[in-house]
Amino acid sequence: MAHSAIDRLARATPSSLARRVRGLSDRAIAWVFVTPTILLLLAINIFPLIWTVRLSFTNFAANKPNAEVKWVGLRNYTRILTDPDIWQTMQATAHFLFWTLLFQVVIGFSLAWLINRKFRGNDLLTTLIVLPMMLSPAVVGNFWTFLYEPQIGLFNYAVEFFTGIPASSFSMLGSVTLAPWSIVIADTWMWTPFVMLICLAGLRSIPDYIYEAAEVDRASKWRQFWTMTVPMVLPFLMLAVLFRGIENFKMFDLVVQLTGGGPGSTTLLTSIELKREAFEKWRTGYSSAYAIILFVTVFGLASIYVKALNKVKER
């Protein structure tokens, strides 16, 4: 019965089409399969980018589609680059990026180093550590909003237990000083497991015979760590920093859930400011210029970083 089905399928396939496919070169067949994907990428990514660039030179407003659209040249870009509020937003974003990356790399590598050393309950501990990464930012935001509650939040009571500061005397989300750190803590809790997994992959890729040779040469554990482990794991660490840096630069949902950009503008990151300009103030041309500036910034920094990463890999 199976043979009869195959025979019917073979008869249903036009012989001329089969001959044409067999007559194509490998390169031509590759283009046949790749072309739909390229067209899809052009439609989803390239065309909107070109359209955004065009809008950035106009005064277009999406809530006034019938209004006259005027060409304003570089005025939008000039206003953005000379606006002190924009630079304050950039500073808040840089603060968030620096501390989240620092904490995630240090804690993530430390956890990877711990888990790489086999012990009882290793698999269970790994599963528990990875759990936060599996949650959505909205869930994490709600979870930490509850933890930060001055009256009933466990975070405030933990601070009181270790420092003696009354739990009700401070608010992580309502304080201008503490609000940025509340986001750093929540994001670190959520994404440190990602860095840990990448570092763990790097640690487990190091052959055992390298450490055995070091033991024969009587190299101390400290020297093995700094001269062997760190250099071999460094490309993995840099890759984790690249991924997390790009994602944190685009951070939106977790911040909106926790602080909404407040209090004041202390946690107003570039992504939130861009959303306000585009969909609350409806300054589409201005926000398009802002988006292009952010795109060029991220693309430029990522390109420089990737070159540095490639040099590290070539060592």
Residue ranges and their predicted role:
Residues 26-315:
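A structural signal for multi-pass alpha-helical bundles of membrane permease subunits
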Residues 1-24:
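Short, Lys/Arg-rich, polar N-terminal cytosolic tail immediately upstream
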